[in-house]
Amino acid sequence: MKNVIYIADIDQDIDDLLTIRYMAERSVFLKGVVLDPMPTSDVGKARVKLIESWGVKVFDSIPEDAEPKNPMGVAEPTEIVYCGGALTKVAEYVKDHKLKQLVMNGGFVGEPIVPSNKALPKFRGKSAVRTFNFNCDVAAADAVLKSDNIEQIILVGKNVCHDDRNTFEVIWKDETYLTEGLPVRPGKKLHDLLAVYEGLVFYGLNGYKDNHVLVYKEVYPFNNGLKGNMTEWGSSLEPTGYKKVLAAVGWV
């Protein structure tokens, strides 16, 4: 039994909410959602009630043991975390616990791994850029990317998430039901949904949809010095001081 937690910031972006709905319907292994930060706006609080109406448990930190139980009736530890926000809660958890897999929307793979002729126009010639989720808590990102308590890290970064295919008009056209009752603008890039989709495929938890839409390469993340939310992140084929990760480099 694989226990899955999703970390979301539902005050900031509707993408996280759409992703939770997708996971609730696709993954019978979803243990619950950690909200970081807990919503303070009226819209965010209403979204919490909506999430609970889908039968999803809401936590304020990654639970050590919880449902679902294994065939022996024993609650198992969290094994997989999908992160659509800051890495704060992950950094706290892996101080004393192990994870089999962390999948997140974050990081960047640019030059020279992704050459300019294959990069999105906005990223051509760039080897490092600011990336929102890492920069929400750079100290946590730094700690997580060095942690020996995470077996595998998979990064789905802005070099693929910003592609025009990553919308309800293209690859998500069969999932438009996710928008029912929710304000989603045309052409909205679905960063977190793409990362979670790929993570579920890696572990065979995605029901009838089991084909990757992204291609990956083993890389080492790097930054040009920790500078808070101005930190620029990239990827290297050579060791950088961070652990080796599997990062999306392009589309199938």
Stretches found by the model and what they are:
Residues 1-252:
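N-terminal acidic, glycine/proline-rich low-complexity segments
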